[in-house]
Amino acid sequence: MRIPEKFTINSQEITVELVNTLPSQNFGEYCCITDKIKLATNVKDDGTVIPLKEEQIENTFWHELLHAFQWHSKGVFSEEESNTYAGYLIEFFKSSGLIIK
């Protein structure tokens, strides 16, 4: 899957940036102030840099996208919703044969 560099939600441009690592072993983050999603390509664990698999980065993208949806629809975030719905989306795309380019 090609992760977009930017897209629009609720007339707001959301940008996406791939970064080497994020603090606190985070795989990704959405900032509602800058409307930016950052996705890590690696995670540090006890000083060791571990590369993330493509599937992990894609799952993180969907998770953070759902945080953007949450923020723009109700002004709050829910980790439980984002985790659950990101998993549902990935399972749907894989099982349906729907291809996202």
Cite the ranges covered by each PLM segment.
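Short pre-active-site segment immediately N-terminal to the catalytic Zn-binding motif
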Residues: 37-60, 72-73
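Charge-dense, intrinsically disordered terminal/linker segments
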Residues: 1-3, 83-84
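Post-HExxH zinc-binding segment in Zn-dependent metallohydrolases
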Residues: 73-101
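Catalytic zinc-binding patch centered on the HExxH motif and its immediate surroundings
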Residues: 2-10, 17-40, 46-48
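Short active-site segment of divalent metal-dependent hydrolases/proteases
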Residues: 62, 66-70
